[in-house]
Amino acid sequence: MAVSLWQQCIARLQDELSAQQFSMWIRPLQVEMEGDTLVIYAPNRFVLDWVRDKYLNIINQFFTEQMGSDAPNLRFDIGSRPSARPIVQATAAIRTSRPVSREVVKPSFNTPHADPIANANHRSNINPTYQFDNFVEGKSNQLGKAAAMQVAENPGGAYNPLFLYGGTGLGKTHLLHAVGNGIIKNNPNAKVVYMHSERFVQDMVKALQNNAIEEFKRYYRSVDALFIDDIQFFANKDRSQEEFFHTFNALLEGNHQIILTSDKYPKEIDGVEDRLKSRFGWGLTVAIEPPELETRVAILMRKAQESGINLPDEVAFFIAKRLRSNVRELEGALNRVIANANFTGRPITIDFVREALRDLLALQEKLVTIDNIQKTVAEYYKIKMADMLSKRRSRSVARPRQVAMALSKELTNQSLPEIGDAFGGRDHTTVLHACRKIAQLREESHDIKEDYANLIRTLSS
């Protein structure tokens, strides 16, 4: 009874969670009955702890509603259920265009070593400085880091391919190298390759020129893990897409891990064949968003600590509130502050930072104003600027207005009452409600999440 109800339980979870959350945390689970106990198997400790902390109450509540006092005890365990017993997986409830295997086969990491192309070493370009330990986690990148950690622990498993997308300088490349370092740590003989998509194109062109295309194919199809950054640069390169299509298929058929990154959601990449874009979404697709204020502060504090600099909290918040677009911009600004402090011997204060970053701060303040946000959002949603300030409450107008209010709260230093005044004299509680509503919708709606990220990129560029 409890095992059969598990299907209904995961259906409820699928309704309540985002597609990313369901695919990452619920989909890998397996269950079986042991006496009056329902054992929930997670693939690793990370998933087990997350599900128990975040979703145990929902699961308990469901079984209590359905079975009352007969509800089973719940126990979590790591691994798979004994193979001789019946199995129910969460994959039964998820809708996917790709058939999902009942059994995950880990790559053997024993593939014969192919002849290298252009004297390339299989993993010479995995940067050992990029680790999970020095990746600053926040709400904006939490899912991406969690997925990457699971891939590092179980390459070729549930999240294959893993597709990370988001603007430049948000940490996608850091995560690729961290996964590579994790795989190599667990499997020193693993053949892990990281590269920019242009390198793949260059290798293919060189192979064609040297009549070595078969060696090229053997090399790329022999790796245990292939990580390609900025896959959007394959756009309009038909021969490269053709070769990558077959490489992709060969690696997935062998349960070898693929991770791709892009600045866009897979289906939005122009100039790439539909059959490739479809395959990009076969595994797990995760957005990496611009870091929120707390994460930006943490990044600055971590970077300062690594540089041996004592950065006052108020200075970190001052910089983080004004530079919002990406991690590289933050680190570049901090490097400039540190260099100026070392050169002048002056203490790092807010006034000192104002002086050291005066051109950068002036540019940011000039670019991001409430008026600019309103115009950008109105143009994006194809509504009139007058509607943004009007009392109209139709969803086609109210939702863009709420988005603009939330962006104004995040991207400017204006107070809630000041933002309300700029939106037709609205009360600060209206602005607060809009901010909370958009935050909720960004968790629940892929479209709103994409719109918000696109607008931040536009306003911060």
Swiss-Prot record:
UniProt KW DNA-binding keyword: yes
Region (Domain II): 87-124
Domain I, interacts with DnaA modulators: region residues: 1-87
Stretch list, region Domain III, AAA+ region: 125-341
Predominant location category: cytoplasm
InterPro entries, A to Z: AAA+_ATPase, Chromosome_initiator_DnaA, Chromosome_initiator_DnaA-like, Chromosome_initiator_DnaA_CS, DnaA_C, DnaA_dom, DnaA_N_dom, DnaA_N_sf
Region listing for Domain IV, binds dsDNA, in residue ranges: 342-461
Compartment list: Cytoplasm
HAMAP family, sorted: DnaA_bact
Family in the record: Belongs to the DnaA family.
Subunit details: Oligomerizes as a right-handed, spiral filament on DNA at oriC.
Stated name of the protein: Chromosomal replication initiator protein DnaA
Organism name: Shewanella halifaxensis (strain HAW-EB4)
Gene: dnaA
